[in-house]
């Protein structure tokens, strides 16, 4: 390990919270507990801001694969702070294959992506087609985050629905996406449920998440409850 990366690891261990480590490890069954240090997200974000743009950060970004969960999250938060779109995209694509859990996958989105929604659609399609669990999930997350408001197009619902997988963390994101679409684009999203165009698990899970959401009107929730299916 490069000395710069070793120094960062030492900094992370200095921020360790053992009770938090035990609690958070239980939420991530795909992450070996011994690779979790136990650093809270606000502390990781503060460290990322301190390191951003430094030579030490540049060395750390090249030090893949990392040995600890928090090193991966710190890596993600450093990518978030990159202001150049092409560089942020390149670092994201280099990092995605090393993500091994939902929490790291969902924790970061480079701010510069919001200014390049048209260009971002190209890598999103590539991510959705990758077959890699967390790369696919990340592509869906970007569609959910950036393309359910003014940039929405109905075919994006098809992009997500067309992903076929037995992987829990992909299918959970599909359900989350459609539940969010019901809140933000109900006219386009609701037919996917009334016409039962999704697989049974995603159909019912999307309904569950929508019914639990505060963004869904009561009338819509009542309708959705009637759409639950057993076959």
Q: Whereabouts are the PLM-identified features?
A:
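Alpha-helical scaffold domains
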Residues: 1-231
